[in-house]
Each structure stands twice: as structure tokens, then as C-alpha cells.
Amino acid sequence: MEEQREILEQLKKTLQMLTVEPSKNNQIANEEKEKKENENSWCILEHNYEDIAQEFIDFIYKNPTTYHVVSFFAELLDKHNFKYLSEKSNWQDSIGEDGGKFYTIRNGTNLSAFILGKNWRAEKGVGVIGSHVDALTVKLKPVSFKDTAEGYGRIAVAPYGGTLNELWLDRDLGIGGRLLYKKKGTNEIKSALVDSTPLPVCRIPSLAPHFGKPAEGPFDKEDQTIPVIGFPTPDEEGNEPPTDDEKKSPLFGKHCIHLLRYVAKLAGVEVSELIQMDLDLFDVQKGTIGGIGKHFLFAPRLDDRLCSFAAMIALICYAKDVNTEESDLFSTVTLYDNEEIGSLTRQGAKGGLLESVVERSSSAFTKKPVDLHTVWANSIILSADVNHLYNPNFPEVYLKNHFPVPNVGITLSLDPNGHMATDVVGTALVEELARRNGDKVQYFQIKNNSRSGGTIGPSLASQTGARTIDLGIAQLSMHSIRAATGSKDVGLGVKFFNGFFKHWRSVYDEFGEL
């Protein structure tokens, strides 16, 4: 479809803008080359799954932290005429009676984008896709300084979720995240995003097996998984003693001067101007299409940049189709932080950004309070999170007829004990949505002797009262530093989510009072 072609072209341009700015002549040449390539290769979504997979790989590589991901989506939304609304502002004058396309951001890591039709009313509810954008990572400690160990420079870090295990050893790790700084002569604190890619600045070395039992693990996460960042010599460039000006930074003494100088240079500020920082370590190796028949996509941080990416691209594709002056629908993608550590933060699913957006935007739109109970009773929330592909090396852990395989379609997550929010009506609704959109649906449920993971689904269901359905794109090697999915699965996710926005209201109406 034409609108999906335009989205892919814009996505490519946005990804390029987030790297090195080319010269004008090179930029024109590249744009002409892209246009020609797109004219030859891009027709409709179903025939270009590999193109979408490659765009996803580039997106993952160029946006290694949650801050970068949300910033990227914000820029993409800007380019597609979504209007930014500050949470700190009054929305009454920003959302008119004609509705429109909007987004807001909390903490730089929690984003909600929405489309509000002119003819919407409370009885029409809201069509929601909720996902999480955080991924397992390693965090720099507030005081990361460590004395050198026989000349080795090291930094103190802490696991975010289930990391700093054997899977993180011997990986090329970059560093990136958000810096807060205050320029000299001003009182305004600003932020900057930094990213060392493609340079791996550190590594957590394993112990050779020749040393016997100490090399076997498990390893102490405090003392045996410390990243090594260098082996500096006294006379090398950049190893000069800290200057009096550098000592003025609140971070001086908390982090090694080499690291402070490095990240300050990335941000284009001076060490003395640094106020605070939130930095992650991450695998810098770029993802790739793999398998002898190109059936797979291998990349880091799939959980859950996978569903987040597919959902946001689907919303933007849908926005190209919808005329807000004629529409009676309210559609949103809301992306959360901190799912991997329980969601109980202001930027997590339990922080209530979705509920806030619906309440504030609906009352600004109607110019009067809206009965939110009516809104949520008529709404559908898709809790989109990755689930588990069948691993052929461990067939005994899977429930027969309840596991997905690659490159087939979206997977419903089911659990009779409430770890997933999907109910029988939700299952039937998804199957009908898939039928209308030409998609296939797979099931995933654990065996009785296994434990279930969790999603944001039960939280959103209990906080809103809306019917909530847990589903997602399936992957192998969940919570590994590198994982895999089907090479068609990103595109299949975009296709299904786009169909959800188009059809959810008419399908849900068929269920009446159920």
C-alpha cells in the first residue's frame, strides 16, 4: 500500500538523520538512490518483510537505550504531523473540536501517541496497543569509580533485570544514555543523549576454563562481573590529572575522569558542566538477517523493542489512512518503561500515563468532563509483549498445540491463573480481527509444571477495567543479550497491528454486551 511505502521511506530518512550528517551533494545522491530502490522494490507490505526487518535492525542498532528509542519515535511522529503535548501544559487549548494527532512523553522513556477523531464519543471507547520499550541492560552505578586493579580500569555497574550473568561475558559493550548538564553562565539544566556506538568501551572478561572450577560459575555479580574499560598508562593522551575546572562538576570523584571526559565529549559539553547521568551498557554488535534461507532475524534487545516498533509503525501507517474530521475513533499506542523490573514507577505501566492521556484529551476535546467508566467499558487494550518461539532443542518444555513458530503470525498469550489478561472473548476477537486482515494467529500457554512470566496486561486491565488481550511477536532466546525472531515477524506484527486499528471497533460491536 502507498502509505506503507511512504512510511518506510520516511523511516529510512529518519534513521539516517540520527547518524552522521552527510554533505549536501551526498545527501541528494543518497535520496535519489533510495527513491529509485524504493520504486523498484517496495510495493505492498506483504511482499517486503525483509525490508521491514532491515529497518528494524537499523533502528535497534542506532537506538541502544530506552531514551534513544523514545527520542526516535518522537522525531518520527513529528515528521508525520503528530503534535507534541507537554504533560506540564494545559491541554484544553491544544486539542480542538476537530480532534487530531498528538503525542506526549514522560521522563524521556514513556510515550503515548494518539489519534482522536472529530466524531468520537465516550461510547466509542479507545483502541489501545500498550507495550514496553525498556530492555534488559546493565546500569552504571551512581558512583561507578573503582580503583584500578593491577592497571586495569574498571567501572561499577548494577544489573537491570536478569543481567550480569554468563550471557553478558565476553561481549563488546558500548555505553550510552542521558546526561544532564548546565552550560556555564546559565541556570537552565538541559539533557543530551549519548551513545558510543560503534565503539565498545568495555568488556566483562570470562575466566579461561584452564583455571578449573572458578571458571565454571555461577559468578558473583558484584565482584566477578565488573566491566573493564581500559589499561591506561600515565603518559598517554587523555590521562592528564583532572583540572580545577573539571573538579567543579558534581560528578567529579564519583566516576573516573576518563569516563567523564569521554561522555562529555560525546555530548559536546565540558566535564565541569555535567550535572548527572543515567548510562547503560549494551551489545554494540549490529543485528542481521540469518539462516540459510534468510528465515531469521538476530539482534539484541528484542524484548521489547520488537512489539514497540511494530505498534508505532502500524499507528503511523493507520494515521495516513484516517481522516480525523470524519473518524469517530480514538486510537493510541502507549509505550512504557520499567516493565522488566515490575512497572511500579511513574514511567511504568502502573504510573498511569494511558489513563491520564485518555482523561485529559477527552475532556479537552469535549470541553467537559467525560464519563471514563463508559470509555473504558467500550475499549480494547492489546498488551503487546514478546512471547516464546518453539525451541527445537528443548521440546519437552512446551505444551503441545500451544507454541508458536517463526514467520506465521501474531501469538496470543494465554494463562488460566491470571498472569496474562486474555479471556475467551478477547481470544475470539483477535481471531476475527486476524480473519478480516488476512492474518494467522498462534497460541502460547505454559505447561502445568512451568512458571509463567508477566506483562503489563494485568496491570492495565485492573487499572482501567477495559478488556485487555495479551499477545505479541514471538522470539527465541528471551532475556539473552542477543535473541532471534522470524525475518517476517516484524512485518507480520506491523500488518496485524495496523489491521487492529482499522477493524477493532466494528469487530467488538459484534460481541454486544459480552
From Swiss-Prot:
Please provide the record's keywords in A-Z order: Aminopeptidase, Glycoprotein, Hydrolase, Metal-binding, Metalloprotease, Phosphoprotein, Protease, Protein transport, Transport, Vacuole, Zinc, Zymogen
**Cofactor stoichiometry and binding?**
Binds 2 Zn(2+) ions per subunit. The average amount of Zn(2+) bound at physiological metal concentrations will be lower than stoichiometric.
Q: Taking the first listed entry, what is the main subcellular location of this protein, grouped into a coarse class? A: other
Keyword Magnesium: yes or no? no
Which amino acid positions bind substrate, per UniProt?
H210, E339, D385, H388
Where are the glycosylation sites? N107, N110, N448
Q: Which residues carry this modification: Phosphoserine?
A: S356
- Kindly list the biological process annotations in GO that this record carries: cytoplasm to vacuole targeting by the Cvt pathway; proteolysis
Q: Tell me its EC number(s), please.
A: 3.4.11.22
**Regulation acting on activity, per entry:** Strongly and specifically activated by Cl(-) and Br(-), which act as positive allosteric effectors. Inactivated by metal-chelating agents.
Cofactor(s) named in the record: Zn(2+)
Keyword hit for Protein transport:
yes
What Gene Ontology cellular-component terms does the record carry?
Cvt complex; cytoplasm; fungal-type vacuole
Q: Which residues form the propeptide?
A: 1-45
Show the Gene3D superfamilies listed in the entry. Aminopeptidase i, Domain 2, Zn peptidases
Q: Report the pH sensitivity of activity.
A: Optimum pH is 7-8.5.
Question: InterPro entries per the record?
Answer: Peptidase_M18 (IPR001948), Peptidase_M18_dom2 (IPR023358)
The residues that hold Zn(2+) 1 are H132, D303, E339, E340, D385
* PTM field: Synthesized in a precursor form (prApe1) that has an amino-terminal propeptide. The N-terminal extension of the 61 kDa precursor is proteolytically processed in two sequential steps. The first step involves proteinase A (PrA/PEP4) and produces a 55 kDa unstable intermediate (iAPI). The second step involves proteinase B (PrB/PRB1) and converts iAPI into the 50 kDa stable, mature enzyme (mApe1).
Give the similarity note.
Belongs to the peptidase M18 family.
Q: What is this protein called?
A: Vacuolar aminopeptidase 1
Supply the source organism for this entry.
Saccharomyces cerevisiae (strain ATCC 204508 / S288c) (Baker's yeast)
Q: What is the lineage of its organism?
A: Eukaryota, Fungi, Dikarya, Ascomycota, Saccharomycotina
